[in-house]
């Protein structure tokens, strides 16, 4: 089966209510794929982190207290939580732009998912309220190819029997999985 077929099969499984995908991909999985593939593997294999840590609580607080009156939250297919602005754009809120590509890819995945699975075309806004920064995000031919490459990558990583090779990254020291990697 070619890699294109993997994405097509994923889309078919998602669109057909009588089928479900082998791997129900979430936005967080897409983000982890672009941050650290080991982190993705751990999370996808049931090795989850403590959601009460300071960094996660800070992110939750920024998300919950920003743009409150101009957006509504929706849960799509019991796994993808979207915020829709009054303008109709999909919004993703992050504390910092330090990991901009993973955040952007997460939002692009949401836009791709809406278009491919639900035939809904939307544009996006990536917001960093603590930095007073916003970026428009559009799903086009190039970004669609990036998302589909990411979907292939996520399916590959999650399907492995063991985590990907250890790779030292600048943010390993603040990663909640660091004890699993560096003990």
From Swiss-Prot:
* Highest taxon listed in the record's lineage: Archaea
UniProt binding sites for [4Fe-4S] cluster: 36, 172, 175, 181
Annotated signal sequence is none
Query: Which GO molecular function terms does the record list?
Result: 4 iron, 4 sulfur cluster binding; exonuclease activity; metal ion binding
The UniProt record gives the binding positions of Mn(2+) as 83, 92
Write down the Gene3D superfamilies for this protein, in alphabetical order.
3.90.320.10
Instruction: Name its co-factor(s).
Output: Mg(2+); Mn(2+); Cu(2+); [4Fe-4S] cluster
User: Is ATP-binding a UniProt keyword of this protein?
Assistant: no
What is the documented disruption phenotype for this protein?
Loss of the 8 Cas genes in this locus (cas1, cas2, cas3, cas4, cas5, cas6, cas7 and cas8b) leads to loss of CRISPR interference against plasmid targeted by this CRISPR locus, i.e. plasmid is not destroyed by CRISPR.
Q: Where are the transmembrane segments?
A: none
Name the keywords, alphabetized: 4Fe-4S, Antiviral defense, Exonuclease, Hydrolase, Iron, Iron-sulfur, Manganese, Metal-binding, Nuclease, Plasmid
GO biological process terms, alphabetically, are: defense response to virus
Q: EC no.?
A: 3.1.12.1
How does the cofactor bind to this protein, according to its record? Mg(2+) or Mn(2+) required for ssDNA cleavage activity. Can also utilise Cu(2+). Binds 1 [4Fe-4S] cluster per subunit.
EC primary class: hydrolase
Q: Which family does it belong to?
A: Belongs to the CRISPR-associated exonuclease Cas4 family.
Biological role stated in the UniProt entry: CRISPR (clustered regularly interspaced short palindromic repeat) is an adaptive immune system that provides protection against mobile genetic elements (viruses, transposable elements and conjugative plasmids). CRISPR clusters contain sequences complementary to antecedent mobile elements and target invading nucleic acids. CRISPR clusters are transcribed and processed into CRISPR RNA (crRNA). This protein may be a 5' to 3' ssDNA exonuclease. Plasmid targeted by CRISPR locus P1 transform wild-type cells very poorly.
Q: Any other comment in the entry?
A: There are 3 CRISPR RNA loci in this organism and a single cas gene locus. A CRISPR-Cas type I-B system.
Q: Which NCBIfam families match?
A: cas4 (TIGR00372)
UniProt-recorded name of the protein: CRISPR-associated exonuclease Cas4
> From which source organism is this entry?
Haloferax volcanii (strain ATCC 29605 / DSM 3757 / JCM 8879 / NBRC 14742 / NCIMB 2012 / VKM B-1768 / DS2) (Halobacterium volcanii)
């Amino acid at each position: 089966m070619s890699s294109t077929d993997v994405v097509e099969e994923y889309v078919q499984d998602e669109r057909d209510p009588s089928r479900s995908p082998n791997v129900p991909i979430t936005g967080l999985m897409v983000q982890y794929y672009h941050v650290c593939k080991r982190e993705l593997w751990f999370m996808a294999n049931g090795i989850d982190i403590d959601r009460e840590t300071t960094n996660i609580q800070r992110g939750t607080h920024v998300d919950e207290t920003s743009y409150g009156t101009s957006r509504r939250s929706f849960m799509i297919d019991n796994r993808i939580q979207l915020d829709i602005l009054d303008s109709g754009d999909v919004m993703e809120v992050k504390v910092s732009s330090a990991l901009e590509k993973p955040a952007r890819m997460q939002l692009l995945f949401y836009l791709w998912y809406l278009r491919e699975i639900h035939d809904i075309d939307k544009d996006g806004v990536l917001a960093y309220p603590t930095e007073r920064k916003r970026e428009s995000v559009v799903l086009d031919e190039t970004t669609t190819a990036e998302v589909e490459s990411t979907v292939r990558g996520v399916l590959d990583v999650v399907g492995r029997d063991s985590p990907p090779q250890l790779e030292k990254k600048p943010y390993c020291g603040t990663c909640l999985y660091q004890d699993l990697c560096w003990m």
